[in-house]
UniProtKB/Swiss-Prot annotation:
GO terms for biological process: translation. PANTHER family: 30S RIBOSOMAL PROTEIN S13/40S RIBOSOMAL PROTEIN S18, SMALL RIBOSOMAL SUBUNIT PROTEIN US13M. Located at the top of the head of the 30S subunit, it contacts several helices of the 16S rRNA. In the 70S ribosome it contacts the 23S rRNA (bridge B1a) and protein L5 of the 50S subunit (bridge B1b), connecting the 2 subunits; these bridges are implicated in subunit movement. Contacts the tRNAs in the A and P-sites. Transmembrane segments: none annotated. GO terms for cellular component: cytosol; small ribosomal subunit. Part of the 30S ribosomal subunit. Forms a loose heterodimer with protein S19. Forms two bridges to the 50S subunit in the 70S ribosome. Belongs to the universal ribosomal protein uS13 family. NCBIfam families: uS13_bact (TIGR03631). Residues 93-122 are annotated as: Disordered. Signal peptide: none annotated. One of its GO terms (molecular function) is structural constituent of ribosome. This is Small ribosomal subunit protein uS13. InterPro entries: Rbsml_uS13_C (IPR027437), Ribosomal_uS13 (IPR001892), Ribosomal_uS13-like_H2TH (IPR010979), Ribosomal_uS13_bac-type (IPR019980), Ribosomal_uS13_CS (IPR018269).
Length: 122
């Protein structure tokens, strides 16, 4: 089993898909990475050689922030927005959508389950 950036890649998936299991690498970046290292996107993770794994690891570490470093950076950015008192920081603090989405309806993912209020009795 190949291990890159602290993540065990799934064995039976194509490299193009398996690389997206790493936080910070999506489909486009996975294709770019495979082109840079010369690894075939159709190759399965099981069939990788040690040299290919090493080259993938070297390019990832040299080029991008992924996994823990990226998560820490995102959290630091959110913390900074909260501390400086920006509107986005306020929305983060209140647990509401940050980028201008409607909240009268929807936004359930960010707000959590509905809190039902008892109706007026007759």
């Amino acid at each position: 089993m190949a291990r890159l950036a602290g993540v065990d890649l799934p064995r039976n998936k194509r490299m193009e898909i398996a690389l997206t299991y790493i936080y910070g690498i999506g489909p486009a970046r996975a294709k770019q990475l495979l082109e840079e290292t010369g690894v075939s996107p159709d190759l399965r993770t099981d069939n990788l050689t040690d040299e290919q794994i090493a080259s993938l690891r070297d390019v990832i570490e040299a080029t991008w922030k992924v996994e823990g470093d990226l998560r820490r950076e995102v959290q630091a950015d959110i913390r900074r927005k909260i501390e400086i008192g920006s509107y986005q920081g306020l929305r983060h603090r209140r647990g509401l959508p940050v980028r201008g989405q409607r909240t009268k309806t929807n936004a359930r993912t960010r707000k959590g389950p509905k809190k039902t209020i008892a109706g007026k009795k007759k």
